[in-house]
Amino acid sequence: MPVAPRKNKKEHADVDVRGGLRRPTLPPYRAARLAVIVALSAFVIVASRPVATAPAPVAGYQQFLSPASPLEVVAARKADRIAWVAFEEGKRNAYTAAAPAFTPVRLTAFIKDDGIDMSDVKISDDGSTVVFVRGTAPNRDGWIANPTADPNGPERAVWAARTTGGPAFRVAEGANPELAPDGSSVLFTKDGQIYRAKVTPLKPAAEMDRGEKPFIREWGTQSTPRWSPDGKKIAFVSTRTDHSFVVVYDMATRMVKYMSPSVDFDTNPMWADGGKSVVFLRHPGLPFAQQAQQGTGTIGLPNGPGFQANTTGRGRGGAGAAGATGAANAQPPRIADVPGLQRATFKGGYTLSVMKADVGSGDAREVWHNQPNDPIATTLANARLAGDYVVFPLVVGGGRGGRGAPGTADDAPPPPAGPVDEWDRYYSLNLSSADSRPVLLTTTDGLIEDQASVEISADEKTFYYCTNAGDIERRHIWAVPVSSGTPHQVTFGKGIDTQPTPLASGNTLATLSADWRMPQSLAVWPLATSASLDRKIVFPASRKGFPLDAHVEPQLILTKAADGMEIHNQLFLPKDIGPGERRPAIVFVHGGPARQMLLGYHYMQFYHWAYGINQWLASQGYVVLSINYRSGIGYGRSFRTAANTGGSGNAEYQDVLAGGKYLQTRPDVDPNRVGIWGLSYGGVLTSQALARNSDLFKAGVDLAGVHLWGSSLDPDAVSFKSSTIGAIDGWKSPVLLVHGDDDRNVAFQQTTGLVQLLRQRDVYYELIVFPDDTHESMLHSRWMYTLGRMETFLKKFLWPHKTMTTDGPRR
């Protein structure tokens, strides 16, 4: 096998800091252009002779990553119109379409690969106005990503467009817009206050109307503003350190009213009864032991006990650590054993209430509360209202439930804990019932990943959700009445359907849809008929140049790790493998680790690209295995929470090693030509493979990987031994490292530190650094450059100079 070229210290690594490019080979576009010129010259010379039909050109990574992809979709509440954000080779734009034709119309004209993100798309109730955010979220230092290093600096701002036509326009600097039902203005929070900006292409005269001066300025920190259905009132949360209020602002009177103010934490306001009521959640306020406010030293304003504990080595500093003024190793103070001093509950011992307030009077009543000492129903995170019902997800243990849960009397003790359910479940709670009991909606066994996976119909009667129930390697849409009932499947087949978005009429469902050779698209499904048979692809309208026929259908392959853990993988086999031929192979490891690769194009942007890259690698002749290692999602809670993973033991690497060994046993794989690639957590496992098993993995591409778990450099620490650097002396194989230095997920120092270790061990590496770029590069051009380098790197170290067969090498 070829040996990595030896270079002196100065030339040991092929380093590329973009902006100071040094590359030994022609860029792909120049190489392609040269090939075209040569081919045309040859054609001129032999044109007078009979020629055979030329074979179809092999598609490159450029073609596999060329189609426009919708990223998120929303629907108007009172019109059959949808809006979405699309990514088109680095250009991010907003689109809209309306029933019945659903012809896509581009609303914006951002025609450059400028690295400016677009997100948070919203549409008014009548579908006339669409708003969205341009710019990334700030990092921990408050810096918005600026991947093009624009000297003017970056901005994050709310933009808008009319679906009837006209250019898009900037509304105000801000994010997370809450669009008024009529589309006339947006709300957003900044510096703990609520701002409003009018949605108009003409610059308003007043600062307040431009979103430059607070619209609602109150004591404390204001958050989660929510318009009433008629747009005449705003509900929001006002947090005051040890308690919080739900507040309603009246647009006509410019007055606020507090909903049943108390000493407790009131959160998550939801409008009910057409705007006459507000439903919210209530948790107990802080007991004395948890109060950490700094006082003035007067009789009525002492420091909170929690503040005192922090300064004496307890609290934020932790026992044995110095606080603001305390000494190291100080003993924590004694706390009186008095009920209610350290832990707060409501009377009866419960810790969560669902409240319903009358907006006119401000009075509220309790609708439901959880059980005393209930470890499950503690927050009702992501609860949403559907008519008279609150719908919410729970992680459920066997036999547990809230007050009035099925089979549980209000005064009965909680039943013994059973095994934890492998899946999150959604429940509904009837607010109109005097003896309300949570009702289980999602009786299907499968993953419901996040809030983008669920939606409620416009008439508030049906709960739609995306799950892998019944088809664990894909995603489909299911539906169930919010009042209770048996869920039914809406989409079928080999597709991957996500982000269910029911339209106002109730006749149509929009989704993001893909399959093993169709990249993510925007689809609409008629709900009155067999949806899967009548699906219509709305966007993109064309995939010209996309190599549809170059795809191979991935196979599900099960492997077993050394400890017996069964792992699901996708295998991509090249179409042109000859009898007895052995090919190079590549392992792909996803990031997260809370991810699951599927038997088709993924719904998340990078993993959508990763699937396309794996298809491209297979089209180039590699046998590709994509591994769904333990601690990922899709296979139940026990798999997701597997023991001894990451910095606690690196157990998931066993799954990667098992995948590599599986490839070595295949008769169509050259066992001496196995590589590996991945980003983020995939970079973690790529580096682990190269450090621990360079005998198996002969080359790797590590994008933004973590190489040291935690911060301990103690060689006996579990985190150190679980890290790549704990096995660094075994690293012999070449690696291509890629990282942006404004990474908000993995510290750039993880690559900085690794390079120092590789240099000292004379390990061949190539390095690409993208200044001012993030975890996943924001620029399409940089992805194209990275893949070009990856192609050259893998060919150099994995593609044999001799073709291996089952009978041995041949020239």
Regions from the PLM with identified roles:
Residues 82, 127-130, 186, 231-234, ...:
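Hydrophobic beta-strand positions that form the internal "hydrophobic ladder"
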Residues 98-102, 162-166, 199-202, 250-254, ...:
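Short loop/turn segments that connect beta-strands within beta-propeller blades
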Residues 287-289, 325, 347-352, 380-388, ...:
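Serine-hydrolase catalytic core recognition
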Residues 34-46:
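Bacterial N-terminal signal peptides
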Residues 62-93:
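Beta-strand-rich domains and repeat architectures in extracellular enzymes and scaffolds
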Residues 85-95, 110-117, 131-159, 167-176, ...:
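A flexible loop/linker signature enriched in serine peptidases of the S9 family
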Residues 77-78, 125-126, 181-182, 229-230, ...:
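Residue-level detector of Asp-centered blade-edge/turn motifs that repeat once per structural unit
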